[in-house]
Every structure is written in C-alpha cells, then in structure tokens.
Amino acid sequence: RSPCALPACPLMHGTGMWVGVIIPHSLGGEVVLADNRTFDPDMLLQKIEEAKVQEIVIVGDVFAKPMAKALAGAKARNAPYDMSKMKMVNSSGVMFSADAKKSLLEHLDVVIFDSMGSTEGSMGTSISNRQTIDQDKTGKFQLSPTTRVYTDDGRAVKPGSGEVGLICNGGM
C-alpha cells in the first residue's frame, strides 16, 4: 500500500498544500482530505482510523492540543481510536510545544517531525518520538546547512549568541 497522508490544516497554508499534498503525491502516496470546513478533532481522528492514515499534517499546538484531548476522551470512554497505522505527525507554521508533543505521544506511537521553513525551503527541523522527547529541545531546531542569520546591517550572527537577526536560507 502506498503511503497515506491527511493534511488537517487548510490547503491554502503552505504546510497543508506542500507538506500535506504535493510531497505525498510526488512520492507516489495517497492523500485523504477531511470532509468538514472547521477543525473537529474527533471527526479528524475518525477519518484517520477509517482511511488508515499513516501521516497527519498539522500546524502546531492549535491542532495537537485538541487532538490529544480527543484521544484522551475516547480512551476514557473506553472507545479509543485505532491509530495503529499512524507513523508520523508532521507540523510547521506555529509553535509545537513539548507539552503538546508529549500529550500526543501518550496516545500515538509516532515520529513527530516539527519543521521551520518558508516558501524557499526548509530552514530547520526537530524530530521527536516517545524515546527522545525532551522539554528543553522544543523550539530548538537543527538548522539546514544553507541557513544563516544576519543582522539588519548584514553582519552574520554567531549561532547561540542570542543576537536577533533575519533568517536567510540558500536553496532548497
């Protein structure tokens, strides 16, 4: 069976379209779309279960927290969703906190791929799973080799200096 992804976020968002649709299709995968126009975590989890989705694409805490709450609620009702086919949660666009990641990982045995990017390409990634989730690493990304930070006057910012600058990325 080809990989199956579900972009939970709007397709007008780069995360939804690029990560949720274009990349899975370019890899020969299947894309499942939600039927509703608003975010309903229980409806989303039902769709994941029915379609045997392997990867879900979200936008940080605003999706992860309600999903974790719905997963916990279903478990408390003794009617847990079957998430056994899920392998990855892919997120970009807003903060994806360690607490939200941990909450999801209590219910999903997945890899969480949290990326920082733009139209020009990926600038950094953070990868977590049940064995590696670490409170101190949320919001810290492994930068891509071509990513740099420069001050307004064009000076390169030394990584870890705390100095604020503009993120620049070379190539995709």
Predicted features, each with a name:
Residues 65, 121, 165:
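Glycine-centered loop/turn positions within well-structured domains
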Residues 2, 86, 144, 164-165:
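Active-site lining segments that contact anionic ligands and/or coordinate catalytic metals
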